[in-house]
Amino acid sequence: MMKNQLAGLMKQAQAMQDNMKKMQDQLASIEVEGQSGAGLVKVVMSCKNDVKRVSIDPSLLADDKDMLEDLVAAAFNDAVRKAEATSQEKMSGVTAGMPLPPGFKMPF
């Protein structure tokens, strides 16, 4: 009986690993947008944290350089938070039913 349980567990682990790989591939194609300055600065990135585009409203180009740098950083951080939230949401379906400790983060 123990051998059958172990074989079942190994099969389940392999299926979960395959599902996680598929989900990670999908996350690379999902894009999120971070914004700051009421949408004057936008950063679009994949859920794998690859920045795709940065948009800066022309009205900001004549303004203070330090303020513009702060807005770009804030938009980037907003995009990172959205990418992390989307990744966790998508991966939660893959890890559902696994006895993971509270707060355990999968490596993705």
From Swiss-Prot:
Q: Name one GO molecular function term.
A: DNA binding
**Keywords (A to Z) from UniProt:** Cytoplasm, DNA-binding
Where in the cell? Cytoplasm, Nucleoid
Cross-referenced Gene3D superfamilies, in alphabetical order?
A: Nucleoid-associated protein YbaB-like domain
- Looking at the keywords, is Flavoprotein present? no
Q: Pfam families from the xrefs?
A: YbaB_DNA_bd (PF02575)
Hey, which family's this protein in? Belongs to the YbaB/EbfC family.
The subunit field of the Swiss-Prot or TrEMBL record says:
Homodimer.
What is the protein's known function?
Binds to DNA and alters its conformation. May be involved in regulation of gene expression, nucleoid organization and DNA protection.
Q: In its UniProt entry, what is this protein called?
A: Nucleoid-associated protein mma_2329
State the species of origin: Janthinobacterium sp. (strain Marseille) (Minibacterium massiliensis)
